[in-house]
Swiss-Prot record:
Protein name: Ribulose bisphosphate carboxylase large chain
Gene that specifies this protein: rbcL
UniProt miscellaneous comment: The basic functional RuBisCO is composed of a large chain homodimer in a 'head-to-tail' conformation. In form I RuBisCO this homodimer is arranged in a barrel-like tetramer with the small subunits forming a tetrameric 'cap' on each end of the 'barrel'.
Cofactor: Mg(2+)
Compartments reported by the entry: Plastid, Chloroplast
UniProt-annotated catalytic positions: K175 (proton acceptor), H294 (proton acceptor)
Length: 475
């Protein structure tokens, strides 16, 4: 036995298993400005005290393991360990608790969402002592957020590039999402942009399939953009999905988009991965491309109330990793999204400084310092009758995206785009005149439809369409 081993044993090392709370539950701890703070919804197994469950989360997501190890003596555990510093019961829920955990900054690689998530939402989510575990929120300190580039450009730079101010931007996802040839796809893009939309979009699962290879789609969409710009005098864009099976292929597609001179590309950031997304965001900033982000797969992670991760955490991660737009629900459409919760993470995407507000699900005050903001995209089951509510809920700094609500118009794609543009302009004008869109919205749309036959036809088609289901993710 070496002298060092004997010394280790002599100062108190004892093999075996001990309660996590003896080391990782520290209610006396005063959090530091540089700590990353996490709020976990913890559901312990029967018989497991909440303090032990919270301490287990802190341990397993930082320096701990299931047994005492002698190599703990070779480092300063107090410097590097996560600490569960507070636990509170969830009102109205049996055996559920919010455990607050503080992590020292040195645990995480600079500028890496991948490394951050590998620790905080890694193996701990399979821990047997917990029936369920959900990460509700993270506080990212400026000392860490400043190690990230963030969005390639941000809201103000995008508006300057597009020369569009004072209203939400309008988009449309091309449908059917799969099966069109590249030429017919480009035709649909042209018709929608000519009709008055600012953007059209690849659906998230349009990559490079046998019926439409990516290079052909990019070329026909670029042709559509330039033709629509020449006819309307407005800057137009199409979200060309660069998502691919490898990072190298993804970058090849982004490079080709830049060579075509188009303004924006797209990435599926959860299925593509944070490493790929951050790489693409860096390329987009360096080469003047806007970056639209789709959140495909998010509901697998965030929809269950007691297990997984809330979308507000995914939204913060995206702002750090990089994206100029991200889908954020609609409140009024076909996809999940309760109003106060949605507006909470919309503010986390757009604003520089967001105060703690538990009524909106915001557990921590978040200071983004100078990191650019991200435009929230409202998309999914929306049509012209939703325009007043969307304008009132999301405000000017947003993208309102109507897929079926454009391409489903009885007269075709261009009239569908006209209907949406007329409805939007009417709502913005009414709001600027001081009218209450929440109360008078339907009347605003009816008035505009009297002089726009395209809008009148759209109003007739979708007058009975509603998606009246209760949201699952509520406070």
């Amino acid at each position: 036995m070496s002298p060092k081993t004997e010394t280790k044993a002599s100062v108190g090392f004892k093999a075996g298993v001990k309660d996590y709370r003896l080391t990782y539950y520290t209610p006396e701890y005063q959090t530091k400005d540089t700590d990353i703070l996490a709020a976990f919804r913890v559901t312990p197994q029967p018989g497991v005290p909440p303090e032990e469950a919270g301490a287990a989360v802190a341990a397993e997501s930082s320096t701990g393991t299931w047994t005492t190890v002698w190599t703990d003596g070779l480092t300063s555990l107090d410097r590097y360990k996560g600490r569960c510093y507070d636990i509170e019961p969830v009102p109205g829920e049996e055996s559920q608790f919010i455990a607050y955990v503080a992590y020292p900054l040195d645990l995480f690689e600079e500028g890496s969402v991948t490394n951050l998530f590998t620790s905080i939402v890694g193996n701990v989510f399979g821990f047997k002592a917990l029936r369920a575990l959900r990460l509700e929120d993270l506080r990212i300190p400026p000392a860490y957020s400043k190690t990230f580039q963030g969005p390639p450009h941000g809201i103000q730079v995008e508006r300057d590039k597009l020369n569009k101010y004072g209203r939400p931007l309008l988009g449309c996802t091309i449908k059917p999402k799969l099966g069109l040839s590249a030429k017919n796809y480009g035709r649909a893009v042209y018709e929608c942009l000519r009709g008055g939309l600012d953007f059209t979009k690849d659906d998230e699962n349009v990559n490079s399939q046998p019926f439409m290879r990516w290079r052909d789609r990019f070329v026909f969409c670029a042709e559509a953009i330039y033709k629509a710009q020449a006819e309307t005098g407005e800057i137009k864009g199409h979200y060309l999905n660069a998502t691919a099976g490898t990072c190298e292929e993804m970058m090849k597609r982004a490079v080709f988009a830049r060579e075509l001179g188009v303004p924006i590309v797209m990435h599926d950031y959860l299925t593509g991965g944070f490493t790929a997304n951050t790489s693409l965001a860096h390329y987009c900033r360096d080469n003047g491309l806007l970056l639209h982000i789709h959140r495909a797969m998010h509901a697998v992670i965030d929809r269950q109330r007691i297990h997984g991760m809330h979308f507000r955490v995914l939204a913060k991660a995206l702002r750090m990793s990089g994206g100029d737009h991200i889908h954020a629900g609609t409140v009024v459409g076909k996809l999940e999204g309760e109003r106060d919760v949605t507006l909470g993470f919309v503010d986390l995407l757009r604003d520089d400084f967001i105060e703690k507000d538990r009524s909106r699900g915001i557990y921590f005050t978040q200071d983004w310092v100078s990191m650019p903001g991200v435009l929230p995209v409202a998309s999914g089951g929306i049509h012209v009758w939703h325009m007043p509510a969307l304008t009132e809920i999301f405000g000017d700094d947003s993208v309102l995206q109507f897929g079926g609500g454009t391409l489903g118009h009885p007269w075709g794609n261009a009239p569908g785009a006209v209907a949406n543009r007329v409805a939007l302009e009417a709502c913005v004008q009414a709001r600027n005149e001081g009218r209450d869109l929440a109360r008078e919205g339907n009347e605003v749309i009816r008035e505009a439809s009297k002089w726009s036959p395209e809008l009148a036809a759209a109003c007739e088609v979708w007058k009975e369409i509603k998606f009246e289901f209760e949201a699952i993710d509520v406070l």
